[in-house]
A protein has these predicted regions:
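Conserved N-terminal entry element of GNAT/NAT acetyltransferase domains
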Residues: 1-12, 157
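Hydrophobic alpha-helical core bundles mediating ligand binding, dimerization, or RNAP-core interactions
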Residues: 17-22, 41, 45
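Helix-loop element at the rim of GNAT/NAT acetyltransferase active sites that forms part
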Residues: 19-35
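Acetyl-CoA-dependent GNAT
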Residues: 34-90
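Conserved beta-strand-loop-alpha-helix junction that forms the acyl-donor binding cleft
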Residues: 88, 118-129, 145-150
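Conserved acetyl-CoA-binding loop of GNAT-fold acetyltransferases
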Residues: 133-142
Length: 157
């Protein structure tokens, strides 16, 4: 499995990630549920090279692009970050959620040396919540985003 930093992506790869993100199947689970323009997406990626608090990675397995994992709010002082993921909605590979989650956890804990992983997930996204529970995430709180209930979960190293 290969993790490719968004700042190192080719234009074609950047557009693949945008196409996934703008698909109805993916954007319905995002806080910002509107379609993102190509210019906005490319500008966002250009700004990532200057950020120490966030990192986006395209995940490739056996020459197939399978998804994106991202870390935001990276705090090396507190040894924690928030993470998210989305998969290629046009190629429904079996077990892709597990694969992306494992990749993100290993990357953050083993390579970045962080100790705590946090995430927020819409409470109606039961498939994702069940996946997180299988990885021993613990619900720590709830909040409302876009008038929808969101569960906040954590995983300690």
């Amino acid at each position: 499995m290969e993790l490719i930093d968004f700042v190192d992506l080719t234009l074609k790869e950047r557009l693949i990630a945008l196409n996934w993100r703008n698909s109805d199947e993916i954007k319905k689970w995002m806080y910002l549920q509107n379609a993102i323009s190509t210019k906005t997406h490319l500008d966002f990626i250009d700004e990532l090279q200057f950020s120490k608090e966030r990192q986006y990675l395209l995940v490739k397995k056996e020459n197939n692009y399978v998804g994106v994992v991202y870390l935001t709010g990276i705090d090396f002082d507190k040894n924690q970050y928030y993470f998210g993921l989305y998969y290629n909605p046009f190629d429904k590979m079996k077990g892709v959620g597990r694969l992306l989650q494992e990749a993100c956890i290993k990357y953050a804990f083993n390579l970045l040396g962080l100790n705590k992983l946090k995430l927020a997930v819409f409470a109606s996204n039961l498939r994702a919540i069940n996946l997180y529970k299988r990885f021993n995430f613990i619900k720590t709180s709830e909040k409302i985003v876009n008038r929808k209930k969101v569960d906040c979960l954590e995983l300690q190293r």
